[in-house]
């Protein structure tokens, strides 16, 4: 039986703030949270552990079906992710994992294999789904849709600050190039390209604090009745 619990989709490019905003909004609403990017990153980690060739789609599709991914939801603090029983949380956020996940996400069979896994997160009292095609492909019937964006420079700056605070040495220009390259891949892929849903509310988060964005998103829900 199909679960018709309400869904809020928050899509956008890498670094727009959707992950942090989605976790906080879900915690405040008391709803479940889906980090769809973590699923693709988890497959990327599994592929890396198995030393698979990223240019071998068949092997990556098999890896997708064989990989068991478990989430330990810590609310606003984020997620602990287990890949085939092993803690992969640290590796999930590496830039190399993100690049691998982006390449894997371009494979139609991988996206198809993960589609139902993502939809299974929809259950009462509601779901906040964070990703790149949540409002267009996974939950096109979602009652609430938001698309967060920001300039590539702004997003690179945020990531640079985040990594430096963690003691990870990184060059801003390298991050900017990686973000721009990923934007191009995500927008140009044949299957589920990155774009806002026609009925999504667009929010440019440039210059905005996280709490400002959270309040705006929560305010959108408060001001609307699910269709």
Curated annotation (Swiss-Prot):
CDD domains: CMPK
Catalytic reaction list: CMP + ATP = CDP + ADP; dCMP + ATP = dCDP + ADP
Gene3D superfamilies documented for this protein: P-loop containing nucleotide triphosphate hydrolases
One Gene Ontology cellular component: cytoplasm
Enzyme's top EC category: transferase
Residue positions binding ATP: 12-20
Any one GO BP annotation for this protein: pyrimidine nucleotide metabolic process
EC number: 2.7.4.25
Main localization of the protein described in the UniProt heading: cytoplasm
GO terms of molecular function: ATP binding; CMP kinase activity; dCMP kinase activity
Record InterPro entries: Cytidylate_kin (IPR003136), Cytidylate_kinase_dom (IPR011994), P-loop_NTPase (IPR027417)
Keywords per UniProt: ATP-binding, Cytoplasm, Kinase, Nucleotide-binding, Transferase
Subcellular location: Cytoplasm
Family listed: Belongs to the cytidylate kinase family. Type 1 subfamily.
Name used for this protein in its record: Cytidylate kinase
């Amino acid at each position: 039986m199909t679960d018709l619990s309400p869904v809020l989709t928050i899509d956008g490019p890498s670094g727009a703030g959707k992950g942090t905003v989605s976790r906080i909004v879900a915690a405040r609403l008391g709803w479940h949270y889906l980090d769809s990017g973590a699923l693709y990153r988890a497959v990327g980690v599994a592929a890396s552990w198995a030393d698979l060739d990223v240019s071998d789609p068949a092997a990556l599709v098999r890896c997708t079906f064989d990989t068991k991914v478990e989430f330990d939801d810590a609310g606003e603090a984020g997620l602990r992710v287990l890949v085939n029983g092993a803690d992969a949380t640290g590796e999930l956020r590496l830039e190399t994992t993100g690049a691998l996940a982006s390449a894997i996400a371009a494979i139609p069979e991988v996206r198809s294999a993960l589609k139902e896994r993502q939809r299974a997160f929809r259950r009462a009292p509601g779901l906040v789904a964070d990703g790149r095609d949540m409002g267009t492909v996974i939950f096109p019937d979602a009652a609430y849709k938001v698309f967060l964006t920001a300039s590539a420079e702004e997003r690179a700056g945020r990531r640079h600050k985040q990594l430096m605070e963690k003691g990870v040495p990184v060059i801003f220009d390298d991050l900017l190039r990686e973000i721009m390259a990923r934007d191009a891949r995500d927008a140009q892929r044949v299957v589920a390209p990155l774009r806002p849903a026609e009925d999504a509310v667009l929010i440019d988060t440039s210059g905005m604090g996280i709490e400002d964005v959270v309040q705006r998103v929560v305010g959108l829900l408060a001001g609307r009745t699910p269709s």
